[in-house]
């Protein structure tokens, strides 16, 4: 199964060298094996910890490690792809048994994936994938564990079209440039609204999945496009920043501009209940149980799908109350 879910040009050997991969480096031909053990030393390379989604994901990992009595080597790249590559290299030097990597971006983390393979350490990509034209699941790393970001975008688009009556001038707040969720959520949403000519994305820019930057970017885009009637945001943090900007400008979220968002944080769920967000698509951050079970299954010799899919739900004001206790 193809992980990145979008067409990409095959990189040349020269392109790999530019990315920091040596043309002469001999990669291991097969995936590293994992011995069956009662206790594993697991490396978890987190991309950042600046939002509720990442904090919930990290806590899920820590809780599952504690539950199983395993050692978790945790690093936080603080939003830096270069640091995340360094973090993985440190884990390789520490000889962890297995690595769980949440890649900051698709291309820059490929060297880390390949170096783990060459060092004989199995690696799983979680939440985000790497560029499958350069490193493939089932060949270069065990599997991708995460949501279908294209489908998330599609679900947002389908429900949002219904909410706006198939007519809207949309500002899009994109996630981190070059990341798989940003790429795929944009594609899914665009695919979902292509049959509605009166639904148009009139402005689009990255807010880097951050609340403050999302607010700043939305303010600038809305000032440039006051005719906008809707906002599609790739995550809840940017949505909440945009809501603050709307309210500061004297606008009413949910009336002056309808909003579609992705993640499922407590703030966003409350905003749905309050009528400020029209459509909310879940992106489940609780990876611990599924990721750690995949490690056990791999050690047991079971066949691991190249894509272990997290299932996500959709929410509107009609059904949000049942989700509120689960929101993170």
Predicted regions and their residues:
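N-terminal secretory signal peptides and thylakoid transit peptides that target proteins
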Residues: 1-16
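A residue-level marker of the well-folded mature domains of exported/periplasmic proteins
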Residues: 8-10, 20, 26-328
